[in-house]
Amino acid sequence: MSEAITPTAMKTLFTEARTHNGWQEMPVSDETLREIYDLMKWGPTSANCSPARIVFVRTPEGKEKLRPSLSSGNLAKTLAAPVTAIIAWDSEFYERLPELFPHGDARSWFTSSPALAEETAFRNSAMQAAYLIFACRALGLDTGPMSGFDRQKVDEAFFTGTTLKSNLLINIGYGDFSKVYGRLPRLSFEDACGLV
């Protein structure tokens, strides 16, 4: 059994971490992006399917390519962020299952059911996006996840001719706390949970 993490770590990952809308002018290195991935990849997915594929948009040219897909409320903060991660899912993720899950013929579970494959890829890539957020926080970075964008435009701009489809965007950098909104409430245990 693992030991509980420290209260300080809990604050870093959960209770004092915030969604950021403004960014300090501090770059995020490619080495740091590798560190983020090398942490997040260990988060669990069903049958170790690991369907998420990530494009780290970090150049002015990349941001301009992303611009037409962004909602007006997400435009300025995304263009200002050092990095925007496009979290996508591979619609043919199951082709890697003989390598990732060699305990049986897991590939056939999904080749025989396209609907199951899509549902599995979308759900598990969303889980992996959460792991990316926690990996960023563990490394001292801040994030701003967003679903306010045109997925079709992102897919056309970045994934034409591939098996990838976008799920969500996550801005990554060193946040400007002066631009953080006031802390919003969360649902209580009684409101959100049941015991049976």
Curated annotation (Swiss-Prot):
Swiss-Prot/TrEMBL catalytic activity: 3-hydroxypropanoate + NADP(+) = 3-oxopropanoate + NADPH + H(+)
Pfam family, one: Nitroreductase
EC assignment: 1.1.1.298
Keywords: Flavoprotein, FMN, NAD, NADP, Oxidoreductase
Gene Ontology MF term list: 3-hydroxypropionate dehydrogenase (NADP+) activity
Biological processes, Gene Ontology terms: nitrogen utilization; uracil catabolic process
InterPro entries noted in UniProt: Nitroreductase, Nitroreductase-like, Nitroreductase_HadB/RutE, RutE-like
Signal peptide: none
Cofactors, names only: FMN
EC category: oxidoreductase
Job of this protein: May reduce toxic product malonic semialdehyde to 3-hydroxypropionic acid, which is excreted.
Entry's family note: Belongs to the nitroreductase family. HadB/RutE subfamily.
Protein name stated in the entry: Probable malonic semialdehyde reductase RutE
Species of the source: Enterobacter sp. (strain 638)
